Amino acid sequence: MKTNQSQTAPAEVRENIMGTMEINPLLLKLSIPMMISMLVQALYNVVDSVFVSHVSESALTAVSLAFSLQNVMIAVGVGTGVGVNALLSKSLGEKNQSRANATAENGIFLSLCSFAVFFVIGLTCMKPYFYAQTSDPVIAQQGIRYLAVCCIFSLGIFTQTMGEKLLAATGRTQLSMISQLVGAVVNIILDPIFIFGYCGQALSGTTGAAVATVIGQFCGAGMTLYFNTRKNPDIQISFKGFRPSAKAIGRIYTVGLPSIAMQCVGSLMTFGMNLILMAFSATAVAVFGVYFKLQSFVFMPIFGLNNGMVPIISYNYGARRPDRVKKTIKLAVCYAEGIMLAGFCIFQFAPGQVLSIFAASDAMFAIGIPAMRIICLHFLLAGASIVLSSVFQALGNGVFSLIVSVCRQLFVLLPAAWLLAQTGNVNNVWWAFLIAEIVSVLLSLGFYARINKNIIAPMYSPAE
């Protein structure tokens, strides 16, 4: 690995693309590969659910119940990566190579620690988790087999996620996209082979879905390892004599912990919604699970857009270029709202067609079609909220994102859903999403006004 300053200087000059290239093409250059990458990531759970739905509705329900804890696992990996991404980009913008290297090394260490935690969870917590949500032993056992494999072999997803964030932080989003594609293609190929028993009954059904998923994740992780060691000269990673730095870890989690908490709040929301909907029927839970898988194809491109946006904002924040920061935010909001409008049209005008992908029963169609049409109304407001949430993180104010997320999903959505469920009509429950989104966008706009006044506007003054 490169060690002397003369070798790192050219890399720093090249990295100035985030400070000099016109914003619109730069945002598209960094975001489009990440948007594709995030769509590919959405395929992991969606493909599992599509194939599993052809096994039985109980298997589909089991995978839906597993999603809450799966999302916590993803939250830890992605949230830690968000902290690494923002701080590494900011360090490069400040020309602080040693801090950039330390951020990357400690980020990798944290991803290994995360794997150790979920390895233990996979061995000890599966039964209580599922039986807290359902009394049906068939659904519970199918879920246990699926989620235990995902947790025990989670090293792949944690190393892949961190590797992708390191590539994105240095502007190499195309390589991150390739890593995602490799993992997803492997998963798609292996899913039917395992799920339908071609590798034996012991690895069929939900167990097979999990095995295919983790193999795909390990393949993606291998690609990120190769790209970061061979194709990413702008960070020099060396674990010779490495010791975890409390200071570096603290900086990472100052930005990343709100993101982790925010996504974990989402897991609590899905867990709570499952409990509310199970009072109606297991089919209602399956419909909610299918909705969550389908909506990922709308939301994931915006998360990819944010992944391309964050390093641009962080870099120019470090370089004190407020004009570029504000233009990046405006363009990102416009693109996000365009994506959400497209998603709204699909869910509003073709809900039956998308449900049919999951071998939906008549009962699923009866609940699912009105559910899709009602829930998608909040898409029209969500784009701005999602972008502003990442803006807060990129500017070191991730706590604002956390406040918005907690208010939206715990203080508004779940209570509203519970109250609407008391009407005895499951269709009324779905209106809680629109109610919560209205609160979310109002809070986000208020916090952005504060960020603009206290952080962005002062950058127009010369640094002292």
Identify what each model region corresponds to.
Residues 1-31, 88-155, 201-257, 313-378, ...:
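Short alpha-helical transmembrane segments in multi-pass integral membrane proteins
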Residues 20, 24-43, 47, 69-76, ...:
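Residue-level signal for short hydrophobic patches within transmembrane helices
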Residues 29-48, 149, 160, 183, ...:
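Transmembrane helical elements of multi-pass membrane transporters/channels
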Residues 39, 43-61, 130-137, 193-204, ...:
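Helix-terminus/linker motif at the lipid-water interface of multi-pass membrane proteins
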Residues 49, 86, 127, 165, ...:
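Small-residue-mediated transmembrane helix hinge/kink sites in multi-pass secondary transporters
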Residues 60-120, 157-176, 287-351, 382-404:
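Small-residue-rich hydrophobic transmembrane alpha-helices
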Residues 81, 150-168, 176-184, 209-224, ...:
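Short runs within selected transmembrane alpha-helices of multi-pass transporters and secretion channels
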Residues 122, 165, 191, 195, ...:
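Structural signal for membrane-spanning alpha-helices in multi-pass inner-membrane proteins
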